[in-house]
Swiss-Prot record:
Homopentamer. Channel that opens in response to stretch forces in the membrane lipid bilayer. May participate in the regulation of osmotic pressure changes within the cell. The chain crosses the membrane at residues 16-36, 84-104. It comes from the Bacteria. It is a multi-pass membrane protein. GO terms for cellular component: membrane; plasma membrane. This is Large-conductance mechanosensitive channel. GO terms for molecular function: mechanosensitive monoatomic ion channel activity. One of its GO terms (biological process) is monoatomic ion transport. Pfam families: MscL. Its main location: membrane. Keywords: Cell inner membrane, Cell membrane, Ion channel, Ion transport, Membrane, Transmembrane, Transmembrane helix, Transport.
Amino acid sequence: MGMVSEFKQFAMRGNVIDLAVGVVIGAAFGKIVTALVEKIIMPPIGWAIGNVDFSRLAWVLKPAGVDATGKEIPAVVIGYGDFINTVVQFVIIAFAIFLVVKLINRLSQRKPDAPKGPSEEVLLLREIRDSLKNDTLKNPTVP
């Protein structure tokens, strides 16, 4: 029973729950970014450089074929277009995270409080100093 209660205590800590929420939101955000890149950003870029569909860009190392027994042999392909899409997705996600962290840092930095006036002791010492100065000016013979 000790291990179960320890696990429950671990799982219910704030950090673990925050992490779980972050993972779920991150997965959903990843899908949004994927759709943004594949459906909104890359098509105009592909159109601008000559109607290129980045998701279909690939180097065919060995074309598909059929062996002697009639069995189909799939092509060997390096799909660099998908890699380009993934890099663009990464840049967008990294920039979004940068903006969020920057916002959090800005919000967490407390503005320094306005400097408080001098303490009562300092005010009293100033008053004594000024009083002594005035006495010295009025009666310069007093040592």
